[in-house]
Amino acid sequence: MAPQTETQAKAGFKAGVKDYRLTYYTPDYQVKDTDILAAFRMTPQPGVPPEECGAAVAAESSTGTWTTVWTDGLTSLDRYKGRCYDLEPVAGEDNQYIAYVAYPLDLFEEGSVTNLFTSIVGNVFGFKALRALRLEDLRISVAYCKTFQGAPHGIQVERDKLNKYGRGLLGCTIKPKLGLSAKNYGRAVYECLRGGLDFTKDDENVNSQPFMRWRDRFLFCAEAIYKAQAETGEIKGHYLNATAGTSEEMLKRAVFAKELGVPIIMHDYLTGGFTANTSLAYYCRDNGLLLHIHRAMHAVIDRQRNHGIHFRVLAKALRLSGGDHLHSGTVVGKLEGEREVTLGFVDLMRDAYVEKDRSRGIYFTQDWASLPGVMPVASGGIHVWHMPALVEIFGDDACLQFGGGTLGHPWGNAPGAAANRVALEACTQARNEGRDLAREGGDVIRAACKWSPELAAACEVWKEIKFEFDTVDTL
């Protein structure tokens, strides 16, 4: 019997290490409509050619490994391998490049964000030849989009459920975020909803701690919702956080919320995980619950401009996994959010079709096919003086979330809610009349103060509050 080495030689196998670019750098490749496309910001180690780094990213996130293996001959690498098909230097940076990589559709399990991310943002981010690597954008092909359910309901269905049209929605995160008893928590919920808000929200930190177990919180919040609805004649909701230590416990909390008859629940999709989030989204569609998504942990992943994952990619992942709301930053509050970049991923959340626009950080044209849109949630250090800018920036299909900007009102929670509602309706009316909120917004708010003492008091408290810092992540 011939030695194994002779058999390998006859089959064309040659052991050893060869440059990735010999196999995975293919600048002549014609991208297919079914491909998943990725734009990576690469910082190669000194002395490593960008072509080799781009090819390494394509290889290590698809079929490649560090050495030639004889089992390559048992499959079709041309069919399954990722390809670095283009490189471009990053303007203003000495050693950064955008590497464009195309992945065949068959590399990914249908309907699984978990599998998609395991491949594309897996071990390759620890690759030694790279000093830093950031996933800037993904193009999700229509063929792959059609394997996902997406949002449980979407923007239009939510408006129909709430019977609220023609303005943005108002919310408030209950503060202090930790330490309240369930009864006192429910009292704050009632006061905010009674004062004019559409929603109140569990802070992402609130799960089921010793000071307030989840079942008690759900019961007192449901009581608050029904009382506020009866007194205002409006449909109200509270984002009951179903996030838990296990998927089974998460679904148990969702079931209890459904039994209480509340309209909406909440999940932390990054800390809870994509698999758990997708399971919850399926449950919510089947049972008529809206799903509010918080992005706790996102800044660990997306804030550094040369390493990690840009939030526009995390937003796309959520649109696939499923959620009716997603926190998106504010541009004007205390949390990170550069205007054009924020508007770029807000459009990616809401619109069915978004054209490539590098001025807003959108690297690929994205067609979402029939996936429902996700409502952006603006929250973090915002108050009534920000309302003109928020209405101008986000339009009507957004939820404006005032936590301290409601509960910090000098007269209490209900007046704080009333101040926000008056400010929102005044700005919406002014916009509808053709007024320029960017230029006249302050005048609109001051005019409304004349007939709303609650708004006047809020304006006096927060007239000097600003959060003006340079953004860390810029184009």
Swiss-Prot record:
E.C. number, please?
4.1.1.39
Catalytic residues? K175, H294
Q: Does the keyword Plastid apply?
A: yes
Q: Is Acyltransferase a UniProt keyword of this protein?
A: no
Give the positions of the site Transition state stabilizer: K334
The residues that hold Mg(2+) are: K201, D203, E204
Q: Which residues carry this modification: N6-carboxylysine?
A: K201
Q: Which GO terms describe its molecular function?
A: magnesium ion binding; monooxygenase activity; ribulose-bisphosphate carboxylase activity
- According to its UniProt entry, what is the function of this protein? RuBisCO catalyzes two reactions: the carboxylation of D-ribulose 1,5-bisphosphate, the primary event in carbon dioxide fixation, as well as the oxidative fragmentation of the pentose substrate in the photorespiration process. Both reactions occur simultaneously and in competition at the same active site.
Q: What is this protein called?
A: Ribulose bisphosphate carboxylase large chain
> Which gene does this sequence derive from?
rbcL-A
